[in-house]
Amino acid sequence: MSDDKKLIDDSPIPDTPVIPAQLQVDAVIQVRCHKDIDCFNACCKNIDIMLTPYDIIRLKKRLGITSTEFLRLYTEPFEFGRNSVGGVKYKPKEGTNECQFVTEEGCSVYEDRPTACRYYPVGLLSTRRQDENFDRASYALVTEDHCHGHFEDRKLTIDEYREEQGLIDYDELGRGWRQLILKVKSAGPAIGNMSKTSLKFFFMAC
């Protein structure tokens, strides 16, 4: 099995639509999202969005509430991976899988939207070798039937796409959190599954 395929297979999301190939920042992709596209808002109707600590800070400031209030109203804890790594993700509108911030005009918190929303339909893949103390970033293309942005007549590099979507600061400020996730995951079965108390502390760190 190739390293690319193994990395995709290890994804916490089953049946992932990610194309199993690691791309670098100079890779050229074809994608464009805009209000006039026929799939506008489709990606916001079936969400599974993990949030970083920086995402939470941006959003709670945007909404004018505390972190505690934001976590209670807009998120839910979850575990992923073989070692039950903890995290928080968007809580959809009750009875649906739709984002609480989506409107007919688009995202109501667009300027402060989370990292995952900015990247879509590109995925950030962070890896860390056992003999290294830093993470390596690569990227993958996400192809889902509802997204027609891949058919738009525009090509750009992943680095250009990241800059366009305001991801440079998000990636830099989220690096410590990604390294923490990788460290917990790389500990493997030596630490066993995280206890309920450990998960609570992990959520607090997030």
Which functions belong to the PLM regions below?
Residues M1-A42, D48-C206:
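Short loop/turn segments that flank or connect secondary-structure elements
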